[in-house]
Design a protein with these regions (language model features):
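Short Cys/His-rich metal-coordination motifs, predominantly Zn2+-binding knuckles/fingers
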Residues: 5-7
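Extended alpha-helical scaffolding segments
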Residues: 9-170
């Protein structure tokens, strides 16, 4: 059975490369790989060490490569990238706005961020889930440095509380 989905299928012996992660090779890096014998377990080689079907492997590598290619779904720093996505495509730019600057005043995200900066929650319905992952490259390998999931409402409450705590009295 696939360790992620529980489906029965053909297991992926190797995983496709994830590209555009700082620190990884220009040709990409692997999130999952077991090349040296020291990393093999109980005589299992390559993808036998993590039970993931070809379908699941294709889905996660394609999704990460898309998020890293699309500027609205990631931020790149010297030592890594942050990717983000949501159940609601209109809310996906939230993390980029929060970390990387604000949009134009006529855009809905500007209104949301403006309310958060004043310590108020936005007056909008929010999607169920929001996801943020930090990726770092090291030659041919990629590691997940953090993974955060919450409701967007929960994430906004945390950001709002942080901004209120950081507020300086004049």
């Amino acid at each position: 059975r696939d360790a992620i989905t529980g489906e029965i299928g053909v297991f992926a012996p190797v995983h496709q490369k994830i590209k555009r992660v700082p620190g990884a090779r220009p040709t990409g890096g692997s999130l999952i790989s077991f090349k040296p014998v020291a990393f093999q377990s109980y005589g299992k080689k390559n993808g036998e060490n993590i039970l993931m079907t070809e379908h699941t492997q294709f889905a996660y590598t394609t999704a990460l490569n898309y998020l890293l290619m699309d500027p609205t779904h990631h931020l790149t720093f010297k030592n890594g990238s942050i990717v983000f996505w949501s159940d609601d495509p209109e809310m996906e730019p939230f993390a980029k706005e929060m970390i990387g600057g604000f949009s134009k005043p006529e855009e809905p995200m500007y209104q949301i961020m403006n309310r958060l900066l004043r310590g108020r929650m936005p007056r909008t319905s929010l999607p169920d889930r929001y996801y943020i992952a930090g990726l770092r490259g090291n030659a041919g390998r990629i590691s997940v440095s953090f993974f955060y999931q919450d409701t967007l409402n929960g994430l906004m409450k945390r950001v709002s509380n942080h901004l209120l705590r950081m507020k300086m009295d004049s």
